[in-house]
Amino acid sequence: MVEVKVLVEGYTNADSVEESGTEKSCPTITLVRDKNIVMVVDPGVLEDQQMLIDALKKENLEIKDVNIIFLTHSHIDHYRNVGMFQNARVLEYYGLWEKNTVDDWKEQFTNDIKIIKTPGHNYTSLTLLIKTEKGIVAIVGDVFWKERFPEKDVYADNASQLAESRKKVLELADFIIPGHGPMFKVEK
């Protein structure tokens, strides 16, 4: 069975940036392990590199052990640290990157890991649906910033697509790992 572990709990003050004057964000960085896959989802921003390295060490892993980086969407706060992972292939909206080539990804990545398109926040938004012992975990990027983020996403490319993507995720998932907060249970 697939193991899913939040390595770094994300944060953002984007919903209150007017009060502070400065926006600070780090995505929720997640580890996914399945057979020979050691995947990091949304490796984050430069100022949080050491926090990521330390979190991997707690899992008895080093940067070189990671073989796939999955990017939920193409916003820099989610992908800036991708260059740290020299041994990893990058899986994102346009495909699976190995050096300078890309192969189309398949909707069914493994038996227990499925990729779905969830546009709205960004047209490149993808969600991982992972079958675990606890149920289906959805790693959604900024489809949901955090559990109680306001309905209106001021950064959304397309609000109606985002609403549809959120609805789809809520129907499919038992737990959601949002873009900038702790995992939460879906109330059904």
Residue spans of the language-model regions?
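Beta-strand-turn-beta hairpins that frame and shape the catalytic cleft
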Residues: 1-4, 33-38, 106-114, 131-137
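Active-site neighborhood of phospho(di)ester-bond hydrolases with catalytic His/Asp-centered motifs
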Residues: 41-43, 65-75, 81, 91-94, ...
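Zn-dependent metallo-beta-lactamase
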Residues: 1-36, 167-172
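Short glycine-/acidic-enriched loop or helix-start segments at secondary-structure transitions
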Residues: 16, 50-52, 79-81, 149-150, ...
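Active-site HxH/HxHxD metal-binding segment of metal-dependent hydrolases
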Residues: 20, 24-26, 44-111
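Metallo-beta-lactamase
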Residues: 123-188
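A short catalytic or substrate-binding loop motif that flags glycine-/basic-rich loops and adjacent residues
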Residues: 22-24, 119-122
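Short beta-strand micro-motifs in enzyme catalytic cores
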Residues: 28-30, 114, 124-128
